[in-house]
Amino acid sequence: MWFMYLLSWLSLFIQVAFITLAVAAGLYYLAELIEEYTVATSRIIKYMIWFSTAVLIGLYVFERFPTSMIGVGLFTNLVYFGLLQTFPFIMLTSPNFILSCGLVVVNHYLAFQFFAEEYYPFSEVLAYFTFCLWIIPFAFFVSLSAGENVLPSTMQPGDDVVSNYFTKGKRGKRLGILVVFSFIKEAILPSRQKIY
């Protein structure tokens, strides 16, 4: 009896480990696709926002969900459209991003409050959370790295603004003080960029 009980816990641990690795690999692959196809990703997220808006309107018309919950959901989708304007470059300190994070919390609070008072089967509650609360923030979360330069980029020496100002576009001539400053800059603050 105890041996089978021990085996069941061991198998549960192994299954959770495999599921975790599969989800991590899937998220990694999804992030790679998003980085490669940012225009298509932006279009897909836009369609997801429109779909979520249609679901919210359908819940209001057919299911008589509370006006406050639907109104906050529609306003959140409007904020998501604002985030989509600068996609894939999402600033974590922008008011739009901070507002969207706050609205996600407010939406969850309103949903928990509503579903605590009204009975709905678990599958319907999960459908609401999936389509109206989770799918769009998850898409933005997975695509956060799309705006970053993950791999080091290449540049020619003196390709920055200061070098162009001092040399006035003359690549062959280097001023003495500029060489010293370039050396100090690379010694103190080495860049990740390869210089050819």
From Swiss-Prot:
Keyword field contains Ligase: no
Listed GO CC annotations: COPII-coated ER to Golgi transport vesicle; endoplasmic reticulum membrane; Golgi membrane
Gene that encodes the chain: TEX261
Species assigned in the record: Homo sapiens (Human)
Membrane-spanning intervals of the chain: 3-23, 42-62, 70-90, 97-117, 125-145
Alphabetical UniProt keywords: Membrane, Transmembrane, Transmembrane helix
GO MF annotation list: COPII receptor activity
InterPro entries: Svp26/Tex261
Source species, domain of life: Eukaryota
GO BP term (any one): endoplasmic reticulum to Golgi vesicle-mediated transport
Compartments, record wording: Membrane
Designated name of the protein: Protein TEX261
